[in-house]
Amino acid sequence: MTVQSAASDDAAIEMANDVRYGLAASVFSENVGRAMKVAARLDFGTVWINEHLFPLASEMPHGGFKESGYGKDMSLYSMEEYTRIKHVAVKLA
């Protein structure tokens, strides 16, 4: 984990998203509303606010973006990775 400061929210978001991987990130701020807005713009599968490596909730999707993997594990969303939906219609008479 690295800790970096930036001149503005836009600069911080640009710096954070300018990486090949996107598993997890943290935003530290006294203003939680501002941190939520930043978190929404980060290209990471998990974003913690004022915490890092906080335990993940098992009912929430877990997985990375970009080159940090494909899909979401440990939740109902993971079922979509193993499911193919097919529509079959049969005329019986």
Question: What kind of region is each of these model predictions?
Answer:
Residues 1-93:
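Conserved C-terminal structural/oligomerization subdomain of aldehyde/semialdehyde dehydrogenase
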